[in-house]
UniProtKB/Swiss-Prot annotation:
SUPFAM superfamilies, sorted: FMT C-terminal domain-like, Formyltransferase
HAMAP family with a match to the protein in the record: Formyl_trans
Name this protein carries in UniProt: Methionyl-tRNA formyltransferase
Family: Belongs to the Fmt family.
Length: 314
C-alpha cells in the first residue's frame, strides 16, 4: 500500500533513505531539511545533500529554523500525511509534530539502541572499541532517542573501519530496514520493543579538542581515535610546531619500552611512534595547506627531522 510521507533529514546519511522512498510505491509529500548554511573555506552558502535530492525530484522543500513555531506545526498537520520519516534531521520535533501523523514519526538511528543514543553514535562506537553497531528503526517520542523500536539490524565493525566506512554502510542498511518497517507498520504486523533504560549509553557530539592525540594513551586507543575521526574532525598531533593530521594509522605492537611520543622507526611501511603502551604506525599524514600524503612521501620531505629515539610528534 502507498503511504503519504513527510521526510525530514539533512546530511548525506539521510540520502539513501530518501532515495529509497522516492523509488518506492510511497508518496513523499514534502521534505524538511535544515536551512542553507555557509560551508567550507570560502563559507559559501550550501544546500544540504537532502535538499539537492528533493530539488532534483521536484519535491516541495521546507526549511524552518525551528518547528516550535505554531504556524510551522499547523503547516505540518495540514499535509495530512500518514507518517513522518526522520533521518538525522537536526531539529527537535515538539509533541504537536510528533502527534500529527496516523502512524507517528519513525526515526532511522545509527546504533543498536539503547546503546549510543545521541548525536555521534558511529564515532562513539569506534572510540569505545565496539565489535558491532547497527541501525535501529524507532517510533519517536519526546525523549532523545528513547522511543520504542520497530526493528534493528546489526553491522560488524572491523579493525580497519573508519567513521566514513561505517557511515556509508549503515546509511544503506537504514534505507532497506526503513522500507521493511513501514510495510509492517502499515499492516499492523509489527511488535514494538521497549528500550532497556539500564543499558542506555549516550553518544555526545564530537568536540574538536577530542581529535588531539595524547601519546600516553595506548596505541589501540589512538588507532581507534584516528578511525573514529576520519573524515571529520581528523585526529592530529604536532610536528615542528604545526598541527599534523593523521588520516590512517595501524597498531604494530601492543607493548613497547620506548617513552610515549618517541619515534621508533620510519621506513616505507610507515612512521612508527611509541604510545603509552604499544607502537602506532602512521600511514597517511597531512600538514597545514598541504595534501594528504603517504608516510613514504612524508619521509622523503622531512626525513632529516625523523630521528629514531627522539620525540618528534606531540
Amino acid at each position: 500500500m502507498s503511504l503519504k510521507i513527510v521526510f525530514a533529514g539533512t546530511p548525506q546519511f539521510a540520502v539513501p533513505t530518501l532515495r529509497a522512498l522516492i523509488d518506492s510505491s510511497h508518496r513523499v509529500l514534502a521534505v524538511y531539511t535544515q536551512p542553507d548554511r555557509p560551508s567550507g573555506r570560502g563559507q559559501k552558502i550550501m544546500e544540504s545533500p537532502v535538499k539537492e535530492i528533493a530539488r532534483q525530484n521536484e519535491i516541495p522543500i521546507i526549511q524552518p529554523f525551528s518547528l516550535r513555531d505554531e504556524v510551522e506545526q499547523e503547516k505540518l498537520i495540514a499535509m495530512n500525511a500518514d507518517v513522518m520519516v526522520v533521518v538525522a534531521y537536526g531539529l527537535i520535533l515538539p509533541k504537536k509534530a510528533l502527534n500529527a501523523f496516523r502512524l507517528g514519526c519513525v526515526n532511522v538511528h545509527a546504533s543498536l539502541l539503547p546503546r549510543w543514543r545521541g548525536a555521534a553514535p558511529i564515532q562513539r562506537a569506534i572510540l569505545a572499541g565496539d565489535r558491532e553497531t547497527g541501525i535501529s528503526i524507532m517510533q519517536m517520542n519526546e525523549g532523545l532517542d528513547t522511543g520504542d523500536m520497530l526493528a534493528k539490524s546489526a553491522c560488524v565493525i572491523s579493525s580497519e573501519d573508519t567513521a566514513a566506512d561505517l557511515h556509508d554502510r549503515l546509511s544503506l542498511i537504514g534505507a532497506d530496514l526503513l522500507l521493511e518497517s513501514l510495510a509492517k507498520l502499515e499492516k499492523g504486523d509489527i511488535k514494538l520493543e521497549k528500550q532497556d533504560e539500564a543499558s542506555a549509553t549516550y553518544a555526545s557530539k564530537i568536540q574538536k579538542q577530542e581529535a588531539l592525540i595524547n601519546w600516553r594513551k595506548s596505541a589501540v586507543e589512538i588507532a581507534r581515535q584516528v578511525r573514529a575521526f576520519n573524515p571529520t574532525p581528523i585526529a592530529f598531533t604536532y610536528f615542528e610546531g604545526q598541527p599534523m593530521r593523521i588520516w590512517r594509522a595501524t597498531v604494530v605492537d601492543e607493548k613497547t619500552d620506548f617513552e610515549p611520543g618517541v619515534l621508533v622507526d620510519a621506513d616505507k611501511k610507515g612512521i612508527s611512534i611509541a604510545a603509552g603502551s604499544g607502537i602506532l604506525r602512521l600511514h597517511q599524514l597531512q600538514l597545514p595547506g598541504k595534501r594528504v600524503c603517504s608516510a613514504g612521501d612524508f619521509i622523503n620531505a622531512h626525513g632529516d627531522k625523523l630521528i629514531p629515539g627522539k620525540t618528534v610528534f606531540g
